[in-house]
Amino acid sequence: MRLALVRQRYSAYGGAERFIERALGALGEQGVAVTVIARTWIGDPGTVVRCDPFHIGNVWRDWGFARAVCREVARRPFDFVQSHERIACCDIYRAGDGVHAQWLRNRRAILGPLARVGLGLNPYHRYVLAAERRLFASPRLRAVICNSRMVRDEIRAHFGTPEAKLHVIYNGIDLEAFHPRLRKVHRPAMRQKLGIPQQAPLHLHVGVGF
């Protein structure tokens, strides 16, 4: 089987990147030929196809990448295309960034009148909304991987995607690297390093966008 994984840019801290890196190893062990299609990527160059068309600005950047990827997919004999970007030429989409339409709705709820107007006129948001609609309306789309029930419900509410296409698969965790027994090893030293009293309540938010 020949599988393409699509991600525009590599980030050392990205959840999608962790997902792809784990998939590359696991699928490779099963004899699946995996190709990463990306603008930039860190890894074995033999498994990466670079799509890096010229662009100015974020609308042109995302539109140009999506167009280049779909051209690449059309000329290569992939059995499946799994994308982490909003492109209409994929078989499986991982909705790791949630639903942009819902994010905008939540954002508008906390903004003032002028800021809401600016949000609505922003060309990038308008592009992403259009790309999102094309993705979920695509007859090629077979399945959507949702990393939470909330995302699943939002996709169903905004786009009417059939329940059978929506699959909740939570992010994997390395239970050796993240295990309660390691608390005794790292907790006191890390609190001391950050200047946090040993008994002070501490809330940690893991993710981006905070």
Residue locations for each model-derived region?
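N-terminal strand-loop element at the rim of the active site
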Residues: 7-13, 26-60, 72, 165
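Glycosyltransferase donor-binding loop in the core domain
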Residues: 11, 173, 207-210
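An amphipathic, basic-hydrophobic alpha-helix
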Residues: 55-81, 90, 125-134
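Short His-centered aromatic/hydrophobic patch
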Residues: 83-87, 95-97
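Membrane-proximal helix-turn-helix segments that form the acceptor-binding/catalytic region
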Residues: 121-147
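Carbohydrate-associated surface elements
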Residues: 150, 172
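A short helix/loop element that forms part of the nucleotide-sugar donor recognition site in Leloir-type
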Residues: 179-196
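Conserved donor-binding/catalytic core segment of Leloir-type glycosyltransferases
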Residues: 197-210
